[in-house]
Structure formats: C-alpha cells, structure tokens
Amino acid sequence: MKKLYFLLFAPILSFSAQIEGTWKLAPQAAALGVGPGLGNTSWWSNSAGDVTTRACLFDDSIKFEANGNMTHYMNGSTWLEAWQGAPEGCGAPIAPHVGGAATYAYDATAGTLTVNGLGAHIGLAKVINGAEISSPAAAASSITYNVAISNGGNTLTADINFGPGWWRFVYQRTVPLA
C-alpha cells in the first residue's frame, strides 16, 4: 500500500516543484516579445543586441521558494521606460516596481502563475492583466500569467494578455536541472 500511495502522489509533488528555483530572462533574441495573439511576437521582440543594451534587465532574477514566497532581485538597476517618468535605459528601480519579497501561486494543471504584492511582476513592470499601465501609481497588486515549463524543466515561458495583444517572456533557470 505504501508503494501505491507514493506512486499516486509523486506526480503531484513534482508539478509544484517545477517552478521552484531561480530564473532569469533567457539571454537570447525574442526573450521578450509582443504581438496580436498568444505566442505571436510580430509587433516587437528583443534582438540579440538588446540583451547587451538591456543587460540591467537580463541580470534581474526571480527566486520561487517551495513555501509560496518569491524574491525579485534587481541588483540595483533595471530597464526603465518613459511611463515611469525616467528616460529609457538602465537605472535604479522606481517604486513600487523595486523588486524584493512577494508571494506567488503556481497551478501546473491550469498552467498559471499568479504573483502577489504591489508592483510584483515578471517580465516588464508595465504589463498587467488587461492593460499596459502608464504610471507607477497604476501598479497591480496581483498579476496572473499563463505559463509553460519546457526543456526538461529549465525554460519557463510566461504569456499575458494586456488587451490589444499578448506579451511573452522567456526565462531560464540559473542552475539547470540535471
């Protein structure tokens, strides 16, 4: 009976563990992209050169812990845009999108990741459910992404509908699974 119990519940445990760990945007072209439909990044996607230009964004990491806590590490700088009241480029994070502690809920069956906490996000801070915000004051306290984990558990693809289209963010583990 113990063996059967383990076999029934082992897959459930592995689903929740899929997202645990530390992730960074994949240092490649199209790690960030936007387009008219899910998975379509025809409106814009980052180039390989943007990985260097936006190095302050690509070095940010997000750690998901087993207890539902997450930490967004921005290392003192991230990519800023005009909607934040700053010139486009690398600079000190602007509140409330300053990283730090938040919580998350991952549902492997539904393929969703919800991050909770004012300003908590993955990808770009301006992208929330149903909109791109135009001021830091409009930050959301909860954002839900459609997520898929692939490449042996080492790639996380997050999609979010912002109204007129979809953003896509591709992350990779900082320490790959064996």
Predicted regions: what they are:
Residues 20-26, 30, 155:
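Buried hydrophobic residues that stabilize the cores of well-folded domains
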Residues 33-48:
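Short, polar loop/linker segments at the starts of domains and inter-domain junctions
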Residues 82-85, 165-176:
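C-terminal/domain-terminus segments
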